[in-house]
From Swiss-Prot:
Native species: Bradyrhizobium diazoefficiens (strain JCM 10833 / BCRC 13528 / IAM 13628 / NBRC 14792 / USDA 110)
Summary of subunit composition and partner proteins: Homodimer.
Protein role: Zinc phosphodiesterase, which displays some tRNA 3'-processing endonuclease activity. Probably involved in tRNA maturation, by removing a 3'-trailer from precursor tRNA.
Gene field: rnz
Keywords carried by this UniProt record: Endonuclease, Hydrolase, Metal-binding, Nuclease, tRNA processing, Zinc
Gene3D superfamilies referenced in this protein's UniProt entry, alphabetically: Ribonuclease Z/Hydroxyacylglutathione hydrolase-like
Name of this chain's protein: Ribonuclease Z
Length: 301
């Protein structure tokens, strides 16, 4: 299960209702921030999420609307005397920009809190403990952009009727079987896990894509996702402008979701030039299970 809190859902120009991009993903006791636009620290407080156990930031790219909140967040964490190491993941070019930004404020190699930088590469898999994050390249203007696949493992559960019929008693033996190890019961019979485990269920797949100028080549990462979070900065009537600025239209995002058997489509990176109803209508005509994210929306997948 992944719990998402949308902290910022605007395009490059924020509005009174929408902050610069940031998304909090929580799973298996971990809390991961995707992008950190200006004002993200206040959005964390306003959402009720706060700063606790926040130790990893994934950056889609280094355009300023996605990274300017990092210095303010770090300054506040430093004032709170946080000793936790913050790991920032991003493409090499993205990290170079962030490192130079921090150096301009606090000096080379310095920051208010301990920081580690981890460069992303195509095909890299981050083991977050309880789930994985696959990283894949995305095309957006002159940046080294990345998208992310959050995957929780499907699990097989013990079948009570089978345990009872085979005479497996309550206790440690059942725990061994649940871990996939055969056991020998009191009468000498060996019980194999395959005899008492049901089919794998419960795995979840969440895909988050930030700014992107095309969905070409991305189907292999998005196919069969339970949820796709992706930008929809323009309407289809302005597709030529979308190309000029390296963004998608709502229709393109919806067609991409429909072609890849996505469960739910969540659109973000909203431009103030359109009404939400226009954007949603364009997407829903193609992919009915679409919604537009608003700041402080909380969605569980």
């Amino acid at each position: 299960m992944f719990a998402l809190t949308f902290l910022g859902t605007s395009a490059s120009v924020p509005s009174a209702e929408r902050n610069h991009p940031a998304l909090l993903v929580e799973a298996a006791g971990k809390r991961i921030l995707i992008d950190c636009g200006e004002g993200t620290q206040r959005q964390l407080l306003r959402s009720g999420a706060g700063f606790r156990r926040l130790d990893r930031i994934l950056l889609t790219h280094a355009h300023l609307d996605h990274v300017l909140g990092i210095p303010g967040l770090f300054s506040t964490l430093g004032l709170r005397q946080s000793s936790d190491v913050m790991t920032i993941h991003g493409g090499p070019g993205t990290l170079d920009i962030v490192i130079r930004m921090l150096a301009g404020l606090w000096g080379a190699g310095r920051a208010p809190i301990p920081v580690e930088f981890a460069a992303l590469s195509e095909g890299q898999v981050i083991d977050a403990g309880g789930f994985t994050i696959d990283c894949f390249p995305v095309r957006h203007r002159d940046t080294d952009s990345f998208g992310f696949v959050f995957q929780s493992p499907a699990r097989r559960h013990l079948l009570p009727d089978r345990l009872a019929s085979l005479g497996v008693p309550d206790g440690p033996l059942r725990g061994e079987l649940a871990q996939g190890r055969p056991v020998v019961i009191e009468d000498g019979r060996t019980i194999d896990p395959e005899d008492v485990l049901g089919p794998a269920t419960g795995g979840r797949k969440l895909v988050v894509i930030g700014d992107t100028e095309t969905t070409e080549g991305l189907s292999q990462y998005v196919a069969d996702a339970d949820m796709l979070v992706i930008e929809a900065t323009f309407l289809d009537r302005d597709a030529s402008i979308a190309r000029d600025y390296g963004h998608l239209t709502a229709a393109e995002a919806a067609a991409f979701a429909a072609a890849n058997n996505v469960g739910q489509l969540v659109l973000t990176h909203m431009s103030g030039r359109y009404e939400d109803e226009e954007i949603l209508a364009e997407a829903a005509r193609i992919f009915p299970n679409s919604r537009i994210a608003a700041d402080f929306d909380h969605i569980v997948v």
